[in-house]
């Protein structure tokens, strides 16, 4: 019966004799399809009924989603109710066509019905991470220019991600600071640098681990003697993880307020008890800056975007740190043609967030421009258009409209902000945002109003309007 079915759905015998692929069993064909781009798979599906059935199979598209988004996102989606009744092929289409976000307010100490003692005080330039199903918040700067040294955690229940309770933990924390970086590597947090309220720049490295019942333990990481290479003290730099046990640090504000343009990589030991720094040597280097972002997009590539440069100008350039071999790193600039992007003028920013989300794209939110006007917009940078290898030192030119997309926002709109912090959950579909600088009431003799914010809200990637049964896009009907 199987042989007869194959004959019925295959081209005539003359074609069979000239195309060996027709005689391949289905499991071999599926293996080949997994090596092809999605467009090629869709073209393959249009050749005959048998190939259409193969190319539309749920097992193939589940594997494609895992290939494109990573196994962590796919595993998280399997546990959620989002996929109920939907195939993986439809899920892929929804993520690919995603063009809007929905913001959900979770907590705000300014609300009359909230007890302020149960929340972290308003702050900016802190750190916020998602690790082991917990949000972890540390440090930052607050009213009066004071630094903070507190650590807060909140368990995120997969069944109800919009109800969270903060808990202040005693953890033997690092000294107070703001403008530091804190990244997730496996089940660990890695914190570096920052500035204290005496204006001192720091270059210490701490490693933290979250335990059950929201416990957290910090310890100073051993990076060798003072004679060993290490980054100079700094704050307002950027950092991200790369590979399995490496942290990349770039730029920031160093001693005497000088903006830096150097790049360093910290490689952790197998047991996470120590690390070794080395400085990246590259023919091309991004200009010095602070308040920018680094986002890991692949095991061997990091994206740098924006920040404030030497002349206090706010930047919109994009660079790729390409690591094809250990200690063979190179920076490559990505050039865009923005003629077809009318809203491009709003892209330059500093103090924004840039987070890798579901679909393998970078979600950029907020920040401020050269005039310190804070933003509330969401942009997506589609890094799938950037090759994973073969990048040339002279850079790469791409069509801006195929790479950048401004997203619509549905329902609740958070205040415009800068120097907030954001992190995504395991699925990459939900983004948590806390704090930052927001516009406040204009004070007497002040040129502008400015205040620290203590709001926590969740940003949801909208995968089709059916996700929001009772909400509508402004100006459009469901």
UniProtKB/Swiss-Prot annotation:
Q: Which InterPro entries match?
A: F-box-like_dom_sf, F-box_dom, Kelch-typ_b-propeller
Region entry Disordered: which residue ranges? Answer: 1-20
All copies of domain F-box, residue ranges:
18-64
Note whether Repeat occurs among the keywords: yes
The lineage's top-level taxon is Eukaryota
Kelch repeat locations: 135-187, 246-299
Q: Does the keyword Repeat apply?
A: yes
Entry keywords, A to Z: Kelch repeat, Repeat
* Ranges of compositional bias, category Low complexity: 9-20
Q: What is this protein called?
A: F-box/kelch-repeat protein At1g51550
Name the species this protein comes from. Arabidopsis thaliana (Mouse-ear cress)
């Amino acid at each position: 019966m199987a042989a007869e079915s194959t004959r019925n759905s295959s081209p005539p015998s003359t074609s069979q004799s000239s195309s060996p692929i027709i005689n391949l069993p289905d499991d071999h064909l599926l293996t080949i399809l997994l090596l092809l781009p999605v467009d090629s798979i869709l073209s393959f599906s249009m050749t005959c009924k048998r190939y259409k059935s193969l190319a539309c199979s749920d097992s193939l598209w589940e594997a494609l989603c895992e290939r494109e988004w990573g196994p962590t996102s796919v595993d998280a989606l399997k546990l959620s109710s989002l996929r109920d009744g939907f195939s993986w092929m439809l899920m892929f289409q929804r993520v690919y066509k995603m063009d809007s976000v929905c913001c959900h307010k979770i907590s705000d100490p300014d609300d009359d019905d909230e007890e302020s003692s149960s929340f972290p005080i308003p702050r900016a330039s802190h750190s916020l991470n998602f690790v082991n199903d917990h949000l972890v918040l540390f440090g930052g700067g607050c009213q009066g220019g004071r630094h903070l040294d507190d650590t807060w955690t909140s368990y995120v229940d997969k069944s109800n991600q919009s109800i969270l309770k903060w808990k202040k933990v005693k953890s033997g924390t690092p000294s107070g600071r703001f403008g530091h970086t804190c990244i997730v590597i496996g089940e660990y947090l890695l914190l570096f640098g920052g500035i204290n309220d005496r204006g001192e720049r720091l270059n210490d490295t701490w490693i933290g681990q979250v335990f059950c019942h929201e416990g957290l333990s910090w310890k100073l990481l051993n990076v060798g003697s003072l004679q060993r290479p290490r980054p100079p003290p700094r704050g307002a730099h950027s950092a991200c993880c790369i590979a399995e046990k490496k942290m990349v640090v770039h730029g920031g504000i160093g001693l005497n307020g000088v903006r830096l343009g150097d790049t360093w990589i910290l490689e952790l030991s197998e047991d996470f008890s120590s690390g070794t720094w080395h400085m990246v040597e590259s023919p091309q280097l991004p200009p010095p800056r602070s308040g920018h972002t680094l986002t890991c997009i692949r095991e061997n590539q990091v994206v740098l975007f924006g920040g404030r440069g030497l002349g206090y100008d706010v930047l919109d350039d994009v660079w790729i740190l390409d690591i094809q071999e250990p200690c063979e790193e190179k920076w490559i600039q990505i050039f865009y043609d923005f003629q077809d992007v009318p809203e491009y003028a709003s892209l330059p920013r500093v103090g924004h967030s840039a987070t890798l989300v579901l679909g393998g794209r970078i979600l950029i939110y907020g920040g401020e421009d050269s005039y310190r006007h804070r933003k509330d917009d969401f942009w997506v940078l589609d890094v799938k258009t950037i090759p994973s290898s073969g990048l040339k030192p002279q850079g790469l030119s791409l069509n801006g409209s195929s790479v950048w997309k401004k997203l619509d926002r549905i329902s609740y709109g958070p205040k415009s902000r800068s120097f907030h912090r954001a992190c995504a959950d395991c699925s990459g579909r939900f983004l948590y945002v806390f704090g930052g600088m927001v516009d406040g009431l204009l004070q007497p003799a002040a040129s502008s109003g400015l205040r620290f914010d203590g709001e926590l809200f969740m940003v949801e990637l909208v995968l089709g309007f059916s996700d929001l049964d009772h909400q509508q896009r402004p100006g459009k009907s469901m």
